């Protein structure tokens, strides 16, 4: 029979690792390796009212005397809290505070399971030694063997003549053998001495010393290298090194050796500031670019910071600069994509209260490849105040802005602009619709200065413009049966009348104004231009209609919107009077569609059609097939005629089609590819193909790309050095899970590779 021997004194050593966080869930596609479990571990669960610090000993036979030796024989089980030992035989010397166990021995706690031939534990020092062991780290997929395992008084592990792997039993994809392994339970990382790495049971690498993480905690060390080759940079090898400086700081340093250009180094520092602020600092440097005439030095530095100081204050800052216009086009930066041609430098501090807020902002935007430089905002002050229901459900809003515009060119005029907008809003809301009346007064004062007295903008200008906006919307709905499916159909007509007074603004310079898009939702805006340099006069009515289909679970399956603005009077204010179009009686007809065609097929599209001239101003359509989260097939087409090319100041027509896919070929093999073709130029714009294989303990990705390059004229390289128009190359990523890398590599980031990264184009509310 079983004999339960309850010791009220905690004589058992604490053979357990410190854990700051619960064991994380194992990521998708990892293989769970189950350690052995003794049936006697479940016996303690049958006992009730036992203090977790008490030791429970269960065995078939026992011979014990108080304060002397106790011998246990037959299916022995020691338990204390989450710590368990199972063995055939055990001896507890209470006087010497020693425990020994032999025969089918299993030790288990919440972090590790160990099998061994023998165990010798010294309870006074909380240490133990196990011989001929096999171990499994819970939740980490790490397991291995050791001729001897020592558990120190600091709860660390010392493994002699040991090995470990993350592959399942019988899989010899990789194995690390070492003379000594030390695992720090507090820091959750391991040190390894005199190690050999075996791949497919073949020794391929000797490592005198290395460190590896044994959990998801950050750990200093080398990450796996990346290999690539391209016509732009030649053979490229990146070997990132991660430095865990402190809990709130870390640094990644990446030497990137390129055969065509030289050594390119990238440094990234991440930090936390307080409880709600974070930031990042980047510095990239290429000394003497061998591929360019004159071998110039090329560099990038970036700083970004954002967060909340307290409940009221917010801060944001972002600054980036590069050595030349083609930096992102030539080099694989960690900060921006190769298609980015703007560098935003912004600093902003904001303060929020319930009825008001204020902010101070500075901004400088650098446009790569552009000779025309935008104005700098130095600074801008915003103050907004709002009061709900001041009288008869009428809301009062007051928005104000003071902006000082500077320019790098001393010959350009500068200005200070004060813009004040008091408004009264009367919103009427009901279950079947809404109607909003809005009255604004747009008051703007410009203080303009220039070195040229003949400049028409060298004067102060005051502008006062009234604005009236009436917007109404009605919601109709009814049950509908389509192809045997029950839906709820809505019809949502909306009408807007907009009146904006006219004032001559030809004596005001252009500082931050641009034309806004005329998409469906843009038709119902109360402004035609961004910024406040130009306020377009308007006397117009906009009509629109939206229809939706919602299923029994209230998920949106279909949405179609169409609308147009009718001009009662022609607008006299244009961005460029020399480009005035023939007077039109209406805007473009804008339509948008998002729908689930059938089960896993989705379509999304938009069109802007000039009804007076019968021309298509802009159109795009996307067809998606998404049978599951890891399966995607997307077809797309877009058409934009007469688009301004800012590099040449000429006009181009864009007619482009594309295909993108992500598909698992097997449980372990993924394929990602995309292809975009310019129908107008009859050439491929981009081709990308990637194959990724992932097993339980290693992963590899091989990809090929071919893309058009955007080469800018550059003062650093005036001749453009005979730059190639297209770039092609091959990339290789390899990860051994458990040796400085973690899996999976990720298919989603492959979708973001290339010029046209994947976006889900549908806006269905489901």
Swiss-Prot record:
<feature type="signal peptide">
    <location>
        <begin position="1"/>
        <end position="18"/>
    </location>
</feature>
<dbReference type="InterPro" id="IPR050218">
    <property type="entry name" value="LptD"/>
</dbReference>
<keyword id="KW-0472">Membrane</keyword>
<dbReference type="InterPro" id="IPR005653">
    <property type="entry name" value="OstA-like_N"/>
</dbReference>
<dbReference type="Pfam" id="PF03968">
    <property type="entry name" value="LptD_N"/>
</dbReference>
<keyword id="KW-0732">Signal</keyword>
<dbReference type="Pfam" id="PF04453">
    <property type="entry name" value="LptD"/>
</dbReference>
<dbReference type="InterPro" id="IPR007543">
    <property type="entry name" value="LptD_C"/>
</dbReference>
<comment type="similarity">
    <text>Belongs to the LptD family.</text>
</comment>
<dbReference type="InterPro" id="IPR020889">
    <property type="entry name" value="LipoPS_assembly_LptD"/>
</dbReference>
<dbReference type="GO" id="GO:0009279">
    <property type="term" value="C:cell outer membrane"/>
</dbReference>
<keyword id="KW-0998">Cell outer membrane</keyword>
<comment type="subunit">
    <text>Component of the lipopolysaccharide transport and assembly complex. Interacts with LptE and LptA.</text>
</comment>
<dbReference type="GO" id="GO:0043165">
    <property type="term" value="P:Gram-negative-bacterium-type cell outer membrane assembly"/>
</dbReference>
<dbReference type="GO" id="GO:0015920">
    <property type="term" value="P:lipopolysaccharide transport"/>
</dbReference>
<dbReference type="GO" id="GO:1990351">
    <property type="term" value="C:transporter complex"/>
</dbReference>
<comment type="function">
    <text>Together with LptE, is involved in the assembly of lipopolysaccharide (LPS) at the surface of the outer membrane.</text>
</comment>
<protein>
    <recommendedName>
        <fullName>LPS-assembly protein LptD</fullName>
    </recommendedName>
</protein>
